[in-house]
Amino acid sequence: MLNTLLVVGFGGFIGAILRMLSINLVNKFFPYSISLGTLFVNILGSFIIGLLFSYAQNKGLSPLLKSFIGTGFLGSFTTFSTFSYQNLLLLQSGNYLHFALNIILNVFLCLFAAWLGFLIFK
């Protein structure tokens, strides 16, 4: 159990740092009212989780590695709480079009990315 906690913690450490760097970099080059940085990390994370579970299902993967990537790294790399907060700000500012667009883009593109990732090892 301690090994799993340490592995998840280390994965979370790496994922959180990469999320911060990725969001800042993408938003620097694409400064829109919708955070494309948040959209980017959520799409990429969804694609990776599709890959991970497809690979684990078809080829096998150690529980520790699955915990490191799935729970640790991806749990901190992707961000539903930031997505929720950003949507709340869009709603409060009366920017209803961007609010709806942000939700639609995140939900559909993330599901599509997870599906594509899953297909690779199927």
Task: List each model region and its residues.
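Membrane-interface helix-loop junctions in multi-pass transporters/channels
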Residues: 1-122
